Amino acid sequence: MRRSGSPEHPEPTGTPGRTGRCRRTAGAVAAALLLPALLSACGGPADAAPPDEITVMTWAPSGTGSADRPGMTALAGAVGHELNAGGGLAGHRVKVLTCNEHNTAEGATECARQAVAAHALAVVGSYSQYGDAFMPTLEAAGIPYVGGYGLSTPEFSSPFSYPVSGGTPALIAGSGQQLVEAGCKSVAVVRPDTRAGDTLLGFLAGALKPAGITLKDVKAPERSNDYTEIAKKAIGDDRAGSCVIVALGFEPTANLLDPYRRLQPRRTQLASVIGSFQQSVVDATGGDAGPLSGALATGWYPPESSQVWDVLRSTVRLHGGGVPIDVSDPGVQTTWVAYEVFRQAVERAGNGKQITTKALRGVLDGGEPIETAGATPPLSWGLTNMLPSADSPRLVNTAVTFQRVQGGRLVEQRAGFVDVRKVLAG
């Protein structure tokens, strides 16, 4: 974000969203849910915030364990502080609300209801796998969902969603292409034994098939304290040209690394995607002396060491209030990019004018590219930018980055972005 001024004790931008469920009768609940949708359809309060203030919401799970993303909501507050310290956004003070999504469908729905009740102009830089639960509520109120983490199908199909990355599909397709370039002869993919895991397998196969690379499917439980047998199956006979890609969540990936290290494969190339591990995990597992030394990684954005993130680091330092925020976390980076998109779109919607959700969506749908200072290619959600896919037409950013753990740091393996659009489009 652009800055002008950095007070040591910035004024809070808003109060955290409540996550408790109010006790109402069934009739009252139905009426409460119906009213915002009716009002927004008529251009009522759900469509317009107070003329001197912009309200925005960011949500993510907290207190759930491995799904927690506290850095995303913390960064949202820091960005709000920074914007207000510089005079606000397009002549308006910014009020940032946060909500604990609890990693449940009910929690996601409640957060969406709070956004409607608060007349939020947008939901920005949020994390939830329950798009089927929250998106209908936002759609009914006309509220755009800008820069979600990309965990659910509606984020790439709803006309009210504006994703800033290609989600897991782009990462997996990109990882497959990275392994092809690494000279892999066979690839074992360790992936969750779920429907989502089945989908990931398809994207990976699409990237490997043109090169004639053998793909071995290693299904793994999403939760386990011992992945020894999974690691053994993935490594196999540890012959030259063998590669293993870990496509699990953050916590199971960490649990898999321990038996992988003990097995000490000498010829197998390890690979994964940013989100399954990141710089903080490399540090925690021994850096260059750990199991991730030499590992390949595919990400949405440049590595944390890139100068692209200097402004993010400055925002955290000056406006984060001392709250720990891991700038190598792809969730934090996604929130950062999402707020940059939101900032520019609001400024284009009209400086000093009352800004509505309809006006904001009009800017985002207009097709004029939005620059993110190198964190992504220019982003645009115009019709000509849509992916030719019935399932994920809103997946407009098909670029990934190739990284590698070298000297204990995640660094660029190849400069710039790699486009995997052909793989994703089939």
Question: What kind of region is each of these model predictions?
Answer:
Residues 321-328, 344-410:
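Segments of small-molecule ligand-sensing domains
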Residues 51, 68-74, 87-154, 222-224:
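Beta-alpha junction/loop-to-helix N-cap segments that form part of ligand/metal-binding clefts
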